[in-house]
């Protein structure tokens, strides 16, 4: 038995539509999971018809800007059903499906459908907005469907008939308050918040000086900022401050040691599409990576990577939020029982 489950969908570019439906079905008894509107405006509703539930306890879903496509469908369904709490940052906003049509030379990619949550809201462009937000590792102004040229806009269609599985929306405000209080003096969260705010400010400056002296000064200012921020975190964690960023362990790089020039790396998740013009309901809504053949000899030579045991502040805090949810639900249940008994 477990007290709660955190499903980590960060950097998850998606998968098949069928898998998104099946995964949702593990946590609900039955009901619609997603709507698909074709180019002819026909709307198909995919349902979970299996009344069995694998897990009915407290649930949290952790997402970020690189959570896309099928990940967004699952997170949106969990949020609409109030089956669990969504934590993290705004997702990618990949709410369309494309087909690849073969040509004599190359291929033609055509958008043939859009996905909609059971509430009727599209996941296109806006993505999923978490119930509790974390500082984002990625700049939403440079990564996401909304940053592409001419993306299809967000819109809304008629909601499906569905019954909420739980009632947790009334607890979200208190959960946010508990979260904010907890992370206000959390060294890791303060570090991440300041780091990403600094990167965002730098990313908004689209000018580059051609003056060598000024460029050197900017480089020095940047290094001084990261050194001060790194030492601020280290002191808060009871660690010895460092005199230079060069002292940081290369095997465990931090944001300061990477010191990227933009607010976020230019990474786009694989939110690909079906390779043939199949009906939208049967299409794959996330990318299929090209397989590179590896011989058994090559596999034998590969050494297993050492497991990273560094605590993930986002995952740790998500566990705390889930514990808060469990506590609040128990309090609510106790209050209802007392009201019935009196």
Question: What does each of the following model-derived ranges do?
Answer:
Residues 1-342:
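C-terminal "post-core" interaction segments
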């Amino acid at each position: 038995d477990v007290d709660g489950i955190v499903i980590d969908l960060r950097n998850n570019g998606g998968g098949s539509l069928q898998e998104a439906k099946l995964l949702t079905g593990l946590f609900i008894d039955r009901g619609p999971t997603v709507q698909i509107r074709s180019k002819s405006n026909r709307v198909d509703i995919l349902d979970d018809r299996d009344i069995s539930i694998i897990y009915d306890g407290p649930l949290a879903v952790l997402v970020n800007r690189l959570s896309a496509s099928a990940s967004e469908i699952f997170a949106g369904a969990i949020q609409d059903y109030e089956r669990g709490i969504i934590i993290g940052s705004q997702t990618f906003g990949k709410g369309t499906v494309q087909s690849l049509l073969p040509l004599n030379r190359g291929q033609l990619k055509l958008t043939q459908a859009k996905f909609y949550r059971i509430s009727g809201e599209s996941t296109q462009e806006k993505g999923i907005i978490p119930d509790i937000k974390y500082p984002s590792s990625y700049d939403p102004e440079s990564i996401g469907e909304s940053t592409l040229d001419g993306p299809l806009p967000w819109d809304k269609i008629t909601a499906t008939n569905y019954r909420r599985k739980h009632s947790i929306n009334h607890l979200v405000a208190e959960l946010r308050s508990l979260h904010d209080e907890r992370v206000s003096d959390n060294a890791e969260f303060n570090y991440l918040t300041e780091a990403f705010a600094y990167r965002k400010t730098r990313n908004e400056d689209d000018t580059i000086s051609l003056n060598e002296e000024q460029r050197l000064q900017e480089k020095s200012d940047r290094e001084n900022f990261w050194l001060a921020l790194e030492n601020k975190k280290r002191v808060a964690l009871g660690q010895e401050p460092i005199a230079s960023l060069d002292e940081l362990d290369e095997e465990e790089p931090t944001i300061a040691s990477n010191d990227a020039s933009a607010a976020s790396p230019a990474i786009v998740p694989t939110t690909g599409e079906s390779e043939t013009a199949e009906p939208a309901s049967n299409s794959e809504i996330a990318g299929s990576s090209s397989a590179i053949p590896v011989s058994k000899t090559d596999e034998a030579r590969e050494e297993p990577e050492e497991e990273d045991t560094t605590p993930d502040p986002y995952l740790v805090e998500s566990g705390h939020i889930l514990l808060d949810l469990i506590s609040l639900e128990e309090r609510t249940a106790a209050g209802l029982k007392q009201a019935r008994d009196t």
